[in-house]
Amino acid sequence: MDEVIKLKCASALEECGKHIQRINTALKLLDPVFPLTEDRLNALSDEQTAVLDQFLYRFAKLQDCIGLRLIPSVYVLLENDTVVRPFIDILNRLEKLDVLTSANDWQYFRSLRNNVAHEYPER
């Protein structure tokens, strides 16, 4: 079973790497508009809006991959525990193992991802 979990971790890390690469590319292209204010957001060109869309999409996909694939796989690999547990319990345990710096930070970024995914500025 360890080999299967290791493969799942490797696959998730590879996917995360692709999302991070696209996020970094988008950030470079968006650098001139940061810090992003309401006025700057309203003045974005169609091309800049497309890049911002790509950034938001990749941020959401990265969060999904980490939360749905990587974190559970790392937990199973480290704890050899396949019992289904509440996600917050897994986060807290990984924080205690120093895999995560903060379970609260993870929840904050997950909440941010959910807000971005469900509240998009009208244009």
Where in the sequence are the language-model features?
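Solvent-exposed interaction patches of small proteins and small membrane subunits
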Residues: 1-123
